[in-house]
């Protein structure tokens, strides 16, 4: 029990752990003898179906289930999805709400909302593992599908006390003014697709300052004109993110770029200069880069001058000798990064560590590929694509 209580992140526990807990408390046949606090602690780690079954056992159990936050991994709200389980053969306006109870098991449900005249039609798909188990169809009279879908999603946020770990919002006009969301203090992964900076700001302000993963997108038709401004990029959630990808123009300055803490990131450059990228590489070479750095993808057609970017930096070109010595690595790298100039830059602090710089007409990629390894007391470099 102590081991479960001390988990830094809540999760759905394994069958073995539930069995151990059941033995510890004397099995569920002794459930009625447990005090309320102990019952609540057990409830926190039950899956959704088990909670539903328990809630119909008695009025007191129903009350406990209703006041105990449910564990939810991710909530997703998507605008105008296609291929909606044969709901229609044509595209139509809809909202899909997905609730995932586990990151990897596929245990989830999906609810599709769409408008038919004055009524909202709903299809509810439940999944256990990776198989669809059941489908329900409903009609809500005299209401709006957009409003009802958001209310439904936010109701599930409330059920888990807004403590889910991941959120994915892909909506053009999320009703922020009428929203009940105030804080997402435990959310560590956030994906937002929006057409304005105000929506990005509204969601980021509700998240912790240090995120594991952040992704910002806009409509595909806007990606070459929509720009995330420099002042917005000072958000702590951006500066401290472990991984982030912005699928639109992003006006990072060189200073902001050099102070990022992300191990993996990518964005469309607006203000980044060759000097800024040169300084970024030199920081890594001299041991001042981000610890355990993995990948930086910089999309720009203006920053393809390898001479300016690599000045003052020692490197090894991928010549014939290198390609023969590291044939497996080079082949794997070339599958992901096609035609373009590729060079290897070695750390001055540890020569067994290196990064690959890849230049293409519209991308500069900086990727940690060489890693120190020791086998049979012999130290060597192992090259691999992260």
From Swiss-Prot:
InterPro entries: F-box-assoc_dom_typ2 (IPR012885), F-box_dom (IPR001810), She-1-like (IPR042317). It comes from the Eukaryota. Residues 29-76 form the F-box domain. It holds the Pfam family F-box. This is Uncharacterized F-box protein T20B12.4.
